[in-house]
Amino acid sequence: MSWSKVKYFFFDTPEEKEAAQYSYEKEQTDMKKQQDPPEQQDVPFAKVQPKQNVVSIETAKQSSKVVLLEPRTYSEAQGISDHLKGRRAVVINLQRMSTDQAVRIVDFLSGTVYAIGGDIQKIGPKTFMCTPENVDIVGAISELFGEEEETNIKRW
């Protein structure tokens, strides 16, 4: 390998010599010809309204209902749950049922109330109030139901 090849390898190559022979015209760019950035335009937008905690009295009056029920069989539990899903409070009197079926209904309704985020409270002997999440229960009824409740202590 000759010294000239090494020289071309590191320093000057024949292609560079050819490129140096050509003359390039320098392009001048006109700064005025370049596009200016577009002007900012006002774009209308919808104003986001914060969620209001105020409900009109007429709306609350129409949607608030309490359903009084006295089921006689366990098969009526699904109908009671449908009232709860419809956001209506339900008062259930279970005195005309056998204790076993009453316990099953209370278990079923407890699951329903839990699923919808509501509440269930005992308001008397074999009488319960189930409420959906849109109804608040305030206060408590004392347990002065008499001796009947004390003798029948099985589950509730």
From Swiss-Prot:
Entry's Gene Ontology BP terms: division septum assembly; FtsZ-dependent cytokinesis
Keyword Cytoplasm attributed: yes
Keyword Coiled coil appears in the UniProt entry: no
Annotated region (Disordered), positions in chain: 23-45
One of the Pfam families matching this protein, by short name: SepF
Compositionally biased residues, Basic and acidic residues: 23-36
Coiled-coil region list: none
A GO cellular component entry from the record: cytoplasm
Location relative to the cell: Cytoplasm
UniProtKB keywords: Cell cycle, Cell division, Cytoplasm, Septation
Known function: Cell division protein that is part of the divisome complex and is recruited early to the Z-ring. Probably stimulates Z-ring formation, perhaps through the cross-linking of FtsZ protofilaments. Its function overlaps with FtsA.
Family: Belongs to the SepF family.
Quaternary context: Homodimer. Interacts with FtsZ.
Protein name: Cell division protein SepF
Source taxonomy: Bacteria, Bacillati, Bacillota, Bacilli, Bacillales
Gene designation per UniProt: sepF
